[in-house]
Amino acid sequence: MGKIIRRILTIIPAVALQSLWLLLLMKWLTPYAPIIVSLLSVAAFFLVVFIIIKRDETAYKLLWLLVILSLPLVGALLYLLFGNKRTARPLKRRLQQVQKSCNPQPLPIKEAPFDGEKRMGQTVRWLEEKTQYPMCAVEQVRYYPLGDNMFPDMLADLKNARNSIYVEYFIIEPGHMWDAIVNELEVKMEQGVDVRVIYDDLGSISSFNFSNVRELKKKGIPCIPFNPFLALKGTANYRDHRKMLIIDNEVAYSGGINLSDRYINLEHPYGHWKDTGFRITGEPVKSFTHMFLTFWNAFSLEKEAGQLAMPTYPKRYPAPPHTFDGYVLSYYDSPLNHEATSNQLFIDLLSQSTDYAWFFTPYLMLGDDLMDAMISAAQRGVDVRIIMPGIPDKKLIFRMSRSFYQVLLTGGIKIYEYTPGFVHAKSFVSDDKVATIGTVNLDYRSLFLHFENNSFFYRSSIIAAIKDDFIATQAKCKEVKPYDMKHYSRRWVVDGVLRIFAPLC
């Protein structure tokens, strides 16, 4: 809490100066108020037209239209600060500069080995084209149903690092987990291993601040914040929600697990913490290294840490390695374009599902297209299930998530809440042949407004592991039943209002 207060105290002077400037400006412009109000009203009208015709999620547009039409002047200002993607232009320019310097070669036209599954082949080719990351053969992948299981393996691999260690997480919080990792990073720095750390400034605002960064730099470990949070510049969106640990360009860890004790159940603020992750080796790791270095080179200060050479792209559909375990396409999702890649991938995979489609997610605030895809799949006989937390970490967000329940339940989707505690896992499994696991929640912010990383697996052993874990977790859940309409009539208005504001949360 003290760290949040200190951060707020650094923002207050800027807000005070801005407010004073606005008051003086208003006083000076008072004689011209009628003209100014008329001009601003016209500007608000054109802003409404712009929002209507722009390519964006319907719920997001509806929210801002209501705000601007209700409070034209204030609403227009809020939209310009927080609602449009122009505030992300500096991020986009930096990423584009790095991507141009990479000079990536176009992916070769080559059929994927999908055993005659033409529709799945089309999905993979689309995903490769949108993300510019190739599908690779999996040598070895290990699934972790809990962070408790993954952490010891992370430490063991850190001890064996020889060349490089790259750390990128949304939340870093000092404690047993982070301190143990830092100890290994310090040892490896002394051995000449290249160590780099990226953390999200807003995600870690209450746990990881300037003093923590200074401590790392004293140990010789380069560390940078992603998109420093400045309230007046509208940087609350476009966060780095990615989570990855990459060692020697040979081993990568990812999933929902951040670097904090609650993720390995050493702390229990919301009951038992259910999270998932995976460890992968071989050619697919190059995609993770490329993702990390793209961000590092885009957002680090050259004078401080230097630009790092980008690795070669992983081989696309190589000859199966000696230990072959299916295929994977790992990519990152960016809010700086209009693709919403993970959202579209879920819709596409749901359209192909024939037997079942199961989701883990901590939050449930869907756009209309994805919600319609779920309901459509359920109504044609696909077993669609969602596991949600039983104990929420954010009560208002949980209530907003529940505002979507009735529509989904009456559409044939089964929803379960994890009785022992909080579910933070973010994975999808379908028909025993495809799965995704990464950092993508089923909410608007994650699907449309954050940088995320996700891994799409095809005919790999991890698919059965995710399915088995889902079944085991469901046994600890309580099934949510459709609300009795007698009781629902008293809450549908509240649910409707909450769903309007869901895109902000």
Residue ranges and their predicted role:
Residues 354, 359-364:
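NAD(P)-dependent dehydrogenases' Rossmann-like dinucleotide-binding region
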Residues 1-343, 348, 352, 392, ...:
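N-terminal localization/anchoring segments of enzymes in phospholipid and broader phosphate metabolism
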Residues 360-361, 388, 418, 437-438:
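Thr-Gly-centered strand-to-loop micro-motif
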Residues 426:
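Catalytic-core elements of nucleic-acid end-processing and repair enzymes
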Residues 294, 373-377, 403:
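Short, solvent-exposed amphipathic alpha-helical segments in soluble enzyme
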Residues 363-384, 389, 394:
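Helical hairpin unit composed of two closely spaced alpha helices linked by a short loop
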Residues 369, 398-400, 429-430:
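Histidine/acidic-residue-rich catalytic or RNA/ligand-binding cores of hydrolases
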